[in-house]
Amino acid sequence: MDRVKLTGVVLRAVDYGESDRVVTLLTAERGKVSAFARGARASRRRFGGALEPFTLLSAEVRERSGSDLLGLDSVSVVRGFGALRGDLGRIACAGYAAELARELVRDHQPHDELFDLLVAYLGALDAAPPRPAALRAFELGALRAAGLMPRLDACARCGAPVGEGPVRFDAGEGGALCGGCAPGVPRTLPLAAGTLAALLRLQEGGLAAAASEPLAAPAGREAREALTAFLEHHLGRRLAARRFLDEIGPLLGG
């Protein structure tokens, strides 16, 4: 069968049988794909350490008859992001970003925007300790790529301007709520004016804006809670990596 080359980030690697491994990649060419790496555990000569999560690699794959899994024939590391692997906070944030990317997209649907965003965020983690603003920017960018962006520039229910004061946020309604709509929605979350402004800057400027956005408490907590609720609403659950971030503490980037 014809072989093709893909460039992708390892989102997950799962041991299979005694010697094999199944890897899930977010690729530039085909979106999310899974590939069967025969003998990956038995010998490191063929794949080396290239199949570790968060590795950016170039892979040669082929279709496998009767299987949704591609066959992984050879790989080479494009970028290993070695610096982030020595720090628990960076690993936790990278794991969360990888799991979020995996859950937001379907198989074999190209997502150039999300691929570029994930590579950029892993690069940021490789270069410096995790910043809460960068993780919020990644979440917002991933939601945009998936077509699920929360409404922050106006009321998600009626479309009216939300003004410059504090607002409420509701995941089910789709974002921020004005003073007229919020009382009719139970269990909304607070967003101070400064928190909303910071989220709007991150929504507009992405990871580049995160470099100059402190997002300190309590704004950091409000932003985290709002986006976590929004993601849980659309995914139907809290991601395992999100729970781990909660356990090790928001100061590590969560």
UniProtKB/Swiss-Prot annotation:
It holds the Pfam family RecO_C. Signal peptide: none annotated. SUPFAM superfamilies: ArfGap/RecO-like zinc finger (SSF57863), Nucleic acid-binding proteins (SSF50249). InterPro entries: ARFGAP/RecO (IPR037278), DNA_rep/recomb_RecO_N (IPR022572), NA-bd_OB-fold (IPR012340), RecO (IPR003717), RecO_C (IPR042242). NCBIfam families: reco. Belongs to the RecO family. This is DNA repair protein RecO. It comes from Anaeromyxobacter dehalogenans (strain 2CP-C). The lineage of its organism: Bacteria, Pseudomonadati, Myxococcota, Myxococcia, Myxococcales. The gene is recO.
